[in-house]
A protein has these predicted regions:
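Non-catalytic accessory regions of SAM-dependent methyltransferases
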Residues: 1-117, 166-169, 174-176
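Short amphipathic alpha-helical segments
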Residues: 73-80, 130-138
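Non-catalytic substrate-recognition/targeting regions of SAM-dependent transferases
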Residues: 103-110, 114-116, 132-179
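Divalent cation-coordinating acidic motifs and surrounding scaffolds
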Residues: 120
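Structural motif
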Residues: 125-129
Length: 179
């Protein structure tokens, strides 16, 4: 079992989360010195609100992910990817659609990550260092749910690494192809 640090948020942030606003901003997390990790979110009275992760990115300091106690493991991401795939089933049936977003951050249940499909190849975009840290778990879950994808690449959308894109797994895409 994973032991998570806990953060306590104000009534204002409790209301924000209850409305479904899941981006955690600096003003939401006063006096929190944690970063790049999962956290349990508690209300002002110490009541459990859900699970989030903290990691600096262009917008915000983290994401509230679930009202449940969850662990960001392969099974968790497989579930998210299955739901996302089901939502986009119409795109798979349309022969004229060969490029689309397979997974769209908080809209699919996990802010800080997008996955786009171009033909038979996926592109993961990591928007913060925490998501990048767990990229192997994410990509393995993805491979289980999307075995038809021939290969994948990654785009780094945050500062701190010495590269911006790389091949992740599978076949390499041709230099040029039509989508």
């Amino acid at each position: 079992m994973v032991v998570m640090n806990r953060i306590r948020v104000s009534k204002r942030v409790e209301k924000k989360l209850a409305k479904g606003l899941v981006l955690l901003e600096a003003s939401d997390l006063e006096n929190v010195n944690l970063k790049d990790q999962e956290v349990e979110v508690q209300g002002q009275e110490g009541n459990f609100l859900g699970t989030a992760y903290l990691s600096q990115q262009n917008k915000g300091l983290g994401w509230f992910v679930s009202k449940d106690k969850v662990v960001f493991n392969q099974a968790f991401f497989e579930t998210l990817f299955r739901k996302a795939k089901e939502k986009r089933s119409a795109y798979y049936q349309d022969d004229l659609t060969t490029a689309f977003r397979l997974f769209n951050q908080e809209g699919d249940g996990f802010g800080g990550l997008t996955v786009d499909l171009y033909g038979d190849y996926a592109v993961f975009s990591w928007y913060n260092s925490y998501v990048y840290q767990i990229r192997k778990v994410i990509s393995e879950a993805f491979r289980q749910v999307f075995p038809e994808v021939l290969g994948a690449y990654e785009k780094i959308r945050f500062k701190g690494l010495d590269y911006e894109s790389a091949h992740v797994y599978g076949q390499e895409a041709p230099d040029f192809f039509t989508v």
